[in-house]
Amino acid sequence: MSEKKKVISVMIPTYNEEENARPIYEAVRDEIRKDCPDYDYEILFIDNKSQDRTRRIITDICAQDSKVKAIFNSKNFGQFNSPYYGMIHTTGDCTITICADFQDPVEMIPKFVAEWEKGYKIVIGKKTTSQENPVMYFLRDCYYKTIKKMSNVEMIEQFTGFGLYDKSFIQTLRDLHDPTPFLRGIVAELGPERKEIEYTQPKRRAGKTHNNWYSLFDAAMLSFTSYTKIGMRMAEFFGFFCAAVSFILGLVFLVAKLIHWNTFAAGYAPMIIAVFFVGGVQLTFLGFLGEYIMAMNARIMDRPLVVEEKRLNFEPETPESDTTRAQ
């Protein structure tokens, strides 16, 4: 009797990827068949309420290939919740996350699997260079370095989530019940010994990126509030510093006025500058405080990671989404 093959799960999140959905499916399928012939596989698409033909294309793929599964979200649940939810609904011996836009090279799959077979529970791709906009790459690099210095956890530079995760770590993700998960931080904080494989990130194959300044800022704030205390510490120390400087300057002005009562004219300019400066500082740190409170509120509300609209090619005994809560 032949030994049962290990199963590689490939999770592909999509949002308005009508030009890439079928090509990424074919590329992943062909790569596994060619370079990982001793493994079985499943491909799971999780679609974040696409507004184009993506869902129709994925539905056609599922009808043609029983190894392909799909989860259609009832709305857009964001760039972190949806992929995380897809990961915890894979069933393979390992799960590989890969973007539909081809910026995560499918040629990395056999390299990931080879390192996994050596015993690594997590094998990740780490960008060394990128063919994307050099300004964006520079800003991302600054972000990674900044968050690494400020974080309580040793964060991973140039890591987007692209990688292979053993089923034991996938179970860890299921057990976390985090309603606002930040996978990159979770891997750094809770992941076992990992292998990092460097790669060059290619350009998006087709279509337009869905990351804008707001989504990038949202990602930065999630990592900032989840893994650093620096915002609150900065507010405390800077507030103390401003109070000390204001007290000293106040004494200087008072002494100068007492000594040169008739000739010293302080005027309103210093006062106005000081008021605007302190007001700006207060508003900045109130914003920081608000980010922390929003992060806490999201966790306290205990809402589901995702609410499903539909799923395709799942076995009947697979748990339904509305019972999968981030508790």
Question: In which residue ranges do the predicted regions lie?
Answer:
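Short, flexible helix/strand-to-coil boundary loops that buttress conserved ligand/catalytic motifs
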Residues: 25, 174, 297
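Alpha-helical structural elements of signaling/regulatory helical domains
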Residues: 16, 38, 175-179, 229-233
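Hydrophobic helical membrane-anchoring modules
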Residues: 2-7, 145, 182-327
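Conserved catalytic core of Hanks-type protein kinase domains
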Residues: 61, 89, 115, 149, ...
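Acceptor/aglycone-binding surface of glycosyltransferases and processive sugar-polymer synthases
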Residues: 73-75, 79-89, 94, 105-183, ...
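Conserved amphipathic alpha-helical interaction elements at protein-protein interfaces in regulatory
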Residues: 30, 34, 60, 64, ...
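Short conserved micro-motifs on helix faces and helix-strand junctions that flank
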Residues: 13, 73-75, 163, 236, ...
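Structured catalytic core of nucleotide-sugar glycosyltransferases
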Residues: 1-133, 325
